[in-house]
């Protein structure tokens, strides 16, 4: 499983493996889990390709795709 951390303030869309130490998909006042809130969201995906496609279809002009440099998820 993959988690995509969409952060509106920075424009980063960072993809993590579920087991990554930086993967912390938790509901907050400003960020949702599998739903958008004011500062973005965490979304779960079954594959790298599905997460990347979601980014391509939903990104804004200033959005940046960035796989995590710690867990290093890659396309198969």
Describe the function of each predicted region.
Residues 1-76:
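Mature, structured domains enriched in cysteine- and short glycine motifs
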């Amino acid at each position: 499983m993959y988690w995509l951390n969409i952060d509106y303030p920075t424009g980063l869309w960072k993809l993590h493996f579920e087991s990554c130490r930086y993967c912390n998909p938790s509901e907050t006042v400003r960020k949702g889990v599998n739903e958008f809130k004011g500062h973005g969201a965490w979304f779960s995906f079954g594959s790298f390709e599905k997460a990347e496609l979601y980014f391509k279809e939903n990104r804004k002009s200033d959005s940046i795709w960035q796989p995590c440099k710690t867990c290093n998820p890659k396309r198969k």
